[in-house]
Amino acid sequence: MRHSITVGEAKVLPQAGINLVRVGSMVPSAAALSGWSPALRIPEAHGFRSLLLHGEGLSPWSDQPKTPLALDRLGDGAVLLQLFLRGNPFRAGLNAQEPWAAAIQQLIALNRLAGVVVYGSPYLWDSLKPLLPSSCPAAYSAGQMQEAQRQVLNALFPTATQTGHSGAFTD
């Protein structure tokens, strides 16, 4: 699985923010994205509040092409984008309906982009990666399963050092 994951050097800083998770649809993604999924739990453990987006839910989009994310609907704080979208070159027009490139540029301009993870779509990753500054935590995984989420997010989030627990028994 490690050969199908690409992770940059930058790390996500623990902070109060939004874990914005876009799934292609709720039913097919249910196995990869349950209430205990690493895509939800790891960012939440670092101060992010999870918001799930899917085609049947409320839209996060404004009518402004250069600032497409309606940030007032999301709340304050940095935004970690996790995009669970399958790559299909024959359905490219469907992905064009959601302006993720412009949303990333909007978040960069506002200094609110905490990081980007793309699961499943190499086409989307290839289009978004050139937009990201080298200081932006970013990763791609061909797989969407929970083990892929765990590996990607453990690489992106710094490991908290545990103080006071060495693991040794004392009396």
Protein language model annotation of sequence segments:
Residues 1-171:
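Preference for extracellular/luminal or secreted protein segments
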